[in-house]
Amino acid sequence: QVFHDKCDSYLGIDYSEDLIEIAKENYNYDNCHFQVLSASQLDTADLLVSAPFDIVIITGVLIYFNDDTIKKMIKDLNSLCASNKTIYIRETLSFLETRLTLKDFFSENLEADYNAIYRTDDEFLDFINGIDGNITIETGEIFDELKNFTETGYKYFLIKSVN
């Protein structure tokens, strides 16, 4: 809803069929497309909207992928971007000196076991350094009011091409 009148076309992807159906029902605009697709297996032939993309938004998904997969995703996404790209990443990070890895961890909030890798700032910056071209990087903490744990918190990374 925020983007439909600010762009020629919008493509939202998610691995969850249920979430894609909710998006289709709630955001039924001619220029908005939603697609079930794994972010780790992007192929231009499969996309409902043709590349190149000016803006890419990645939120809350990278904690579920291993390092090699994230490096591949960054490379694949970069190849789908226009030369004047903006990439926004919002992720939960470790506020410890090292990453925090949870495997088969029971969450009372989720009422289920889950796996996640909460990486450090430096680890994320290493991923971002894999983006081609002359870029600027802005980063900061957000959603302080949602910070329930001292070990983790939300951060954003705003990567822009410098032409």
Predicted regions span which residues?
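Short catalytic micro-motifs in class I SAM-dependent methyltransferases
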Residues: 60-64
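Local beta-strand N-terminus motif with an aromatic residue
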Residues: 52-53
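Class I (Rossmann-like) S-adenosyl-L-methionine-dependent methyltransferase catalytic domain
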Residues: 1-47, 65-72, 76, 85-163
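A conserved beta-strand element that flanks and buttresses the S-adenosyl-L-methionine
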Residues: 57
